């Protein structure tokens, strides 16, 4: 996982390591041992000159990043793998789905084939540390700069987390009690 608020986009590599399946450890459990294959995938990606890894599940579908959920935009539709695809459920993922729906962006949870990420209009990952990070290259396939849907959702997310989005003020709780 990484924090990319200051970066324009990141490169990613589809890892040779697979996401741990639901029949091994419940994928919804945020268990420390479950992150081992994510660490291996991340190291593999970095050794190959990429900033992030994308893991496939046991069926060969896109699951998630090394510590992030993944979203793909094609023809204006935002797609993310379903929970049944052995993904790690994420609060940031749920937030982006809710924001997209508020913004009138069609959202679907659907299995994503490896080739779909190469030919997507936009790809981004989300997570507590990554927040909303555009992906501009996957396995030497250039996707280009962050697209309009990614920028729109990223901007809205950043405004919310900075306390500058009145529409979502009830989403925030200030630790100092104010």
Descriptions of predicted regions:
Residues 1-178:
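Helix-start/capping segments and mature chain N-termini
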């Amino acid at each position: 996982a990484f924090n990319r608020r200051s970066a324009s986009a990141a490169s990613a590599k589809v890892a040779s390591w697979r996401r741990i399946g639901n029949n091994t450890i419940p994928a919804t459990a945020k268990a420390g041992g479950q992150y081992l294959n994510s660490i291996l995938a991340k190291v593999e990606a970095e050794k190959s000159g990429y900033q992030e890894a994308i893991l496939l599940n046991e069926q060969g579908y896109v699951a998630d990043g090394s510590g992030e959920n993944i979203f793909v935009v094609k023809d204006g539709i935002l797609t993310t793998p379903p929970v049944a695809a052995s993904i790690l459920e994420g609060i940031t993922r749920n937030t982006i789905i809710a924001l997209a729906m508020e913004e009138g962006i069609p959202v679907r949870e659907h299995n994503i084939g490896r080739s779909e990420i190469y030919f997507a209009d936009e790809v981004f990952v989300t997570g507590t540390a990554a927040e909303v990070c555009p992906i501009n290259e996957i396995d030497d396939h250039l996707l280009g700069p962050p697209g309009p849907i990614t920028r729109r959702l990223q901007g809205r997310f950043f405004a919310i987390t900075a306390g500058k989005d009145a529409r979502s003020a009830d989403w925030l709780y200030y630790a100092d009690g104010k």
